[in-house]
Amino acid sequence: MADDGTTFDASLTGQGGLGRAHAGAMAAHRTALAKVAYLGHDASDAAVRRRVRALLDDGLSVTGFMPHRRKPKDIFWPHTDLGETRDGDFLQRLRSIFSGAGLLSRADAFRGADVIIARNLDMLAMAFEAKRRARLSTPVIYECLDVHRLLTRTDAAGGLMRSLERAFVARTARVWVSSPGFLEHHFEPYHSGRYTAELMENRLPASSEFGPRPELDAERTPGPFRLGWVGNLRCLRSFHLLLDLADRLGGEIEIHLHGVPARREIEVFEPEIDRRDNVHFHGRYQAPDDLADLYAPLDAVWAGDFMEAGANSEWLLPNRLYEGGYFGVPPIAPTGTQTANWIKGHGTGILIDEPLDDSLPVLVAGLMSDSAPLQSARRRLLAQSEEVFVEPRGEMARLVQSVVDEMARR
């Protein structure tokens, strides 16, 4: 089970130089023997496991070196456990960087890797410390799927963290980001000219079986308007917006929550839901197995996030854009965000302005009386190429091979 509330089924198969990956069977063949040391931040995280599966499915040899927050099940790759980490315990995580680096520097699979992939800043620091101890020249890829709140602070602590990241970024072979917003608002302002980036959106993995996409003319399930909030249930403001929407519209609407709530952010969760007959919490779900049934009844999915307002929340592109898009469920999102830019660029959702406490109920009430805008967005979603929502086969192989080839030319 991941931080986003999903469980991954292991049985399923900057302007500083931005590029978009493409499929390539030849690339998969070329990298059949390439050896990857993958440093993930949490072996139990579904997104980490999906990435490892994608690397393996593209013919790469992967050895994982990862801590865990929950005891992981079904480790389906060669793996060295780096111990347990605790969310928010930064002193413990700092110590683990040095202890983990010592272990890595002595591991044959790390020393013999063709490329190192480090997911988040902790693991990037560990990778370079291990390289230093082992005196290696192995290229490192920095995989950045969120810009941590410590990196966006305006005080001395934030400046120190950005300085550390800058030093590491300058030594990486590539930076993989899941949103162009991270490049525009973080990497370019602070690390311009020091990196080469690849855009790696949070698309569904090519190896998974999610079932067919819905038909364009599929009939809506009768009943009240159904709005979903899917994935990482971490935003207190979103939670309150949806509860208020349920209170205002009563039996005309159902709110469906899928995932696991972030207890540090939303301290009172179940009691608020239990007070309302039209709010339903479904708990954890398994991706990709449950996605078709999860999205099938929904009329729209909420795609707003304010947990790190003014920073990461405005720059990211959430999984639900791609999951919902594949199944033809239009997103509703606030303007002024990277998510809104994505929706506008694809013409596949509905945008709303502040104040959301007023505009969201008005919007949903309007969609209930006239569903034409929603149906139009649904048709545009289903008319999009599958590749908009699903990662092409061979993408991981192409990206890794480009780094290996570059190293060989030096």
Each predicted region: which residue ranges?
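Nucleotide-sugar-dependent
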Residues: 237, 287-322, 333-341
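Nucleotide-activated donor-binding/catalytic signature segment of Leloir-type glycosyltransferases, i.e.
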Residues: 259, 267-300
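A short, active-site helix/loop in glycosyltransferases that binds the activated sugar's phosphate group
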Residues: 166-210, 341-342
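Nucleotide-sugar donor phosphate/pyrophosphate-binding loop at the beta->alpha transition
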Residues: 95-98, 138-141, 147-168, 206-212
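Membrane-proximal helix-turn-helix segments that form the acceptor-binding/catalytic region
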Residues: 102-110, 125, 133, 142, ...
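A charged, aromatic-enriched C-terminal amphipathic alpha-helix characteristic of glycosyltransferases
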Residues: 354-360, 371-404
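Conserved donor-binding/catalytic core segment of Leloir-type glycosyltransferases
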Residues: 37, 176, 217-237, 243-246, ...
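C-terminal alpha-helical cap of glycosyltransferases
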Residues: 3, 7-8, 19-22, 387-410
